């Protein structure tokens, strides 16, 4: 969802490149698509008669080679591309696969929109909805009754979902909510136009249905958070923080192969999923071992809990409907990323199938992570401390009113974390009254409906190989008895999840529930299977009724854990075609096969997220809120793998009152230099 008529990064197309250059250099099969390859893919589709003036590219991305092929790392392997093409003139959605090596289309399928759903929302459609409504007599009459003109109103183009409204089957729809904009730099979210919503047929460029319950007072608060009248004087008590690595970072990046402190992986990027981490390995004591074959956030959904007719349909799949990778930001040194930064600039296709480079779209850096381990021992006369650090691979995306950061962290001790950072502006509404049960009052007369941000991580596990299993670990309290006379005993219960039907599970904080993923064919020096443990946050799952439309379409969010047998085609938690899909498929359909997952090649799907009851402090712009999960080695190593981490350099762990500062002067290319609190550096 967005008010922008263009994505956060300008639509600057890369120049065409002769097709002969596409295969000039050997590539790893998991390299990101290049601008040359996107040009070539478009040429192949055009020569096949699949691209005309009315054709739009809803998605274009790399088809990753099969898992067995990837293990061989065959350089120069055939590159396959998937394209989702929408032709408005023919009312036709195509799912096409092509080979860059042969220059041929290898498969095509026409979608049935009623059964299969629609292709993702186009960037072009963000602006179309305002054009359609500005020419609609009913919409204009509704604005006139509110003392407004179309020129004063911005319309949020919002995915439609699937509901019981009549005359919608098979149509490509968006729903539009209006916001008054008082001047070009005004933030319209402060002025929601309530009591009015338009259901727009973007294919036929007409209003399908309009709900207008008459004028509602438009909130008059100021939402311009950079306005000195709102923010006040900039504070002067924040002294600079300098992040310096005079010898450079400890990681290396060659192509998309990233190595750091025993870790190595390949960094991928997809217009739909954003960051994709491939082939995560860890090396320790001369042994390189696989941990995860592929890790991504396969879907995220933002369902709203307001039952009013203007908002009861608000459920946004930001990955499957809006493509979080396509909407990624270009990051700025010292603002989005701080320290010695290495950037990657992924390339995506625009609506016309031309490549668009997202300059500095991926940020890679390492950062201090506090104490790694520490102990003062009077018996041994020792006092040892080591500092931790982590490798950070991240990107930020803007999807309408919200901005999301996707952060993958790798630690020295083998820990893997994912963190989502939610910020931006909460979706607003005119508050019916102060006691309204489904929204918070965040400013006088301004409400923010309750909602959730729910994510699905797809983790294609490969702990020491493909033979993996999952066990559920619960704390068990024991009653007093002959074996527990003081009542202090507790133990841990291990439950094997042997089949897919047994592996649909929920977190339980009262039991300290975690899930242990192990390889029964690979034993550590204690004779136990090597493994990793998934630690969930245990926040609420999908809050909507079980028989609601969104519960069917976002079934992945109804449980914290799903485990499936690996299948190449099972990539997305909410399905391939999420936009206006009726639901009832995907993860529940996967587990309905009830495949054996004990000692098999398996995929762990972890649902997590935030339930947001907005606060006044979330207005006019929301401080970052976070959610995520942790994977910790559990029997994967024979002992603490960080014993070989050296202590900090001499003079850095002193006990005096000295303060050390880096020498003054300029900063090297790729360094952010001092953080000055952002004054004049990260704003406009």
From Swiss-Prot:
Cu cation binds at residues 451, 453, 612. Mn(2+) binds at residues 460, 601. Binds 1 copper ion per subunit. Can also use zinc ion as cofactor. InterPro entries: AGAO-like_N2, Cu_Am_ox_TPQ-bd, Cu_amine_oxidase, Cu_amine_oxidase_C, Cu_amine_oxidase_C_sf, Cu_amine_oxidase_N-reg, Cu_amine_oxidase_N3. SUPFAM superfamilies: Amine oxidase catalytic domain, Amine oxidase N-terminal region. Ca(2+) 1 binds at residues 460, 601. Gene3D superfamilies: 3.10.450.40, Copper amine oxidase, catalytic domain (2.70.98.20). One of its GO terms (cellular component) is cytoplasm. Ca(2+) 2 binds at residues 500, 590. Residues 675-684 have a biased composition (Gly residues). Substrate binds at residues 316-327, 399-404. The active site is at 318 (proton acceptor), 402 (schiff-base intermediate with substrate). It is an enzyme of class 1 (oxidoreductase). Topaquinone (TPQ) is generated by copper-dependent autoxidation of a specific tyrosyl residue. Disulfide bonds join 337-363. The modification 2',4',5'-topaquinone is found at residue 402. GO terms for molecular function: copper ion binding; diamine oxidase activity; histamine oxidase activity; primary methylamine oxidase activity; quinone binding. Induction: By histamine. Residues 647-684 are annotated as: Disordered. It comes from the Bacteria. It is found in: Cytoplasm. PROSITE patterns: COPPER_AMINE_OXID_1. Homodimer. Oxidizes histamine. Other amines including phenethylamine, tyramine, tryptamine, putrescine, and benzylamine also serve as substrate. This is Histamine oxidase. It comes from Arthrobacter globiformis. The lineage of its organism: Bacteria, Bacillati, Actinomycetota, Actinomycetes, Micrococcales.
